[in-house]
């Protein structure tokens, strides 16, 4: 979270495109862990629903959403969450303080 917020506040890395805009963090979430999929975890579903209700201009995924830092491949749980946001018309951006 520290690297993400630092990049956001400084409008660096993946937040550079917003350098001339006023930004507001509407939500900050982490997944519920490996093996917790949407539709199977009530707590995760509630987190997703709250973000869908807010309908932010974009959702940024941090490098911590990857299976590991080496492959830079999103884990299956996060891929499913991102797909839900995309279907709702919310752009999903890969990266905060790092681009992957």
Q: Model-found features: residue ranges?
A:
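Short, compact, well-ordered microdomains
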Residues: 53-100
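Conserved mixed alpha/beta catalytic, RNA-binding, or beta-rich assembly cores of soluble enzyme
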Residues: 1-49, 71-74, 91
């Amino acid at each position: 979270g520290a690297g993400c917020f630092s990049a956001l506040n400084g409008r660096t890395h993946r937040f550079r495109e917003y350098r001339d805009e006023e930004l507001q963090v509407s939500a900050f979430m982490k997944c519920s862990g490996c093996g917790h999929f949407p539709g199977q975890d009530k707590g995760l579903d509630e987190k997703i629903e709250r973000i869908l209700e807010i309908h932010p201009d974009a959702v940024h995924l941090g490098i911590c959403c990857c299976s590991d830092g080496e492959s830079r491949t999103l884990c299956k749980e996060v891929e499913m969450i991102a797909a839900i946001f995309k279907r709702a018309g919310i752009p999903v951006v890969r990266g905060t303080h790092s681009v992957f």
